[in-house]
Amino acid sequence: MKVKGILPGLVTSLVIAIISQGLAQFVPALGAATIAILLGIIGGNTFLKQPQLGRGTKFAESKLLEYSVMLLGATMTVQTIGKIGGFGVLFILCQMTITIVGALWLGRKLGFSQSVRMLMAGGNAVCGSSAIASIAPVIDADEDDKGTVITLVNLMGTVLMLTLPVLGMAVFGGSVILKGALIGGTLQSVGQVVAAASMINQTTVQFATIFKIMRIMMLVVVVLIFGRLHQRTIENELAEDAVVSGNGNGHWLPWYVAGFLILCALNSLISLPAIIGATAHTISSWFEIIALAAIGLRLNLVNFMKAGKRLALYGLGVGTIQVVSALILITLLLQH
């Protein structure tokens, strides 16, 4: 009975993901992930707004995104860090710190909850949907907040994906390393990084991917820090005898983030066969797109539009902080 209850929503999400992959061949600038979430939003708020899809879309949104995060670990190694050098690592660490602090500060100014601020900070600083899915359980974020931030981060990422290649060529000219740093150090998802860098050339793709992987490898650190910050907030509220939600389970590291870390360590130590990394990447990408379709199906467009102006300001503000800080840091640390 449980499988039967899940199937309608799961199959619907899969069909949207397949259609999105097909459409992405004709509109590569958008990418399958963005198309999936947009088609999901359209369907979920019109003819696919059916309660029988709820269990399946919830499963796809949560579980498939978790498996996607874990499988990412098999696609990277610690040795990657050496390819961008000490200043490259310093650039990524500074860029991520500025993004997180900036997103938390701006979110507070705009009146967003702590969970939305943390999801926005982690999603933009690390790796989009995967980071948001990893952070959500350790800060007890509800499904609505998670879906809203994932949608916002993906839409903002699409805008940056189309503009950063032009900006990179205008500012850094022929330097593929600097353009790769701008794209890989700023864009949210791996797919967006590859798509944006491909608009320049294949060498830029390679450098941009290395900078992006460095950010992904910081996922565990960000999850642990945010988990600790949330735990401290709960402790402060308890100390003040406030009413605290009982959702917290005290786990700072979700199982799939631990799995990500184990697979990354394993690949670093024994170098897994290329076929395993390629297969893990393909499955991870498909799981993410199916999950994004489900998130779109579950997103209440009316509620999303109610906060539309604030959300747009938040997304635009965080995106601006990222781009400006990246340009300054690249000039100071990498341009010589």
Curated annotation (Swiss-Prot):
The keyword Transmembrane helix applies. InterPro entries: UPF0324_pro. It comes from the Bacteria. GO terms for cellular component: plasma membrane. Pfam families: Cons_hypoth698. Signal peptide: none annotated. The chain crosses the membrane at residues 5-22, 26-48, 84-106, 116-138, 150-172, 204-226, 255-277, 282-304, 311-333. It is found in: Cell membrane. Keywords: Cell membrane, Membrane, Transmembrane, Transmembrane helix. It is a multi-pass membrane protein. Belongs to the UPF0324 family. This is UPF0324 membrane protein lp_2841. It comes from Lactiplantibacillus plantarum (strain ATCC BAA-793 / NCIMB 8826 / WCFS1).
